[in-house]
Swiss-Prot record:
Residues 228-240 have a biased composition (Low complexity). It comes from the Bacteria. This is Protein Thf1. GO terms for biological process: photosystem II assembly. NCBIfam families: PS_II_psb29.
Amino acid sequence: MTSVPTVSDSKRAFYAAYPRPINPLYRRVVEELLVEIHLLSVNTSFVYDPLFALGVVTAFDSFMSSYRPIEAVGPLFTALTQAVRQNPEQYRHDANAIAEQVRGVGSDTIRQWLTEAEALGNAPELVRSSFQAIAGRSEFKYSRLFAIGLFSLLETAAPDLVQDPEALKTTVTAIAERFHLPSDKLQKDLDLYRSNLEKMEQARITMEEAIQADRRKREQREQEKLAKAAAAEAPAALEASSDNPEPETSETPS
């Protein structure tokens, strides 16, 4: 009988795959995602689908968008997904594929697909199969990452929809009713996700301002050091000049 990996096992695997230092602000994001994906992946009710992949990719990319160096973001995602025994290439591929199938279709169309039983059959393949599977399961394992995937799907289909709080709430409630999802929890998870994005951005700005202030202080100290050195050299140069007066030139009488 194969033992189920623990959260500690997944964390060790992650830090073995990515041993470099991670900024504390972003390390918390990565660890929370790792724990969440781990707990879902070992749950017998969990079933992977492109919508979940979209949620994982969206959450990671959104929270890590300001991470520096930017070249480290890809390896971080790879280490994260592989640590929880998932395939990073599949996640990226499936997330991009389902998003592209709804890009720009508009709020009316996406609402019809996801709230009217007959209309779902007209939806693109990945959207149709993902939501038909949800409807057909006797026990669907809801998660925050599913909620983020749904939000990203709506945002990709109709950016104006997610900018209108009332329209978004009405749509999410209708989708929850259609697929027997926990409406209140779904709405709270989306509100929390958006709130956390704002907090993350504010923290990033504060951190950047602190870095800039520290850089200015270092530059100022360096300038002051150079000024003091120049001031100390000036008297010595003046003294050397007075010790070596230029010889007088005598005029030749005409």
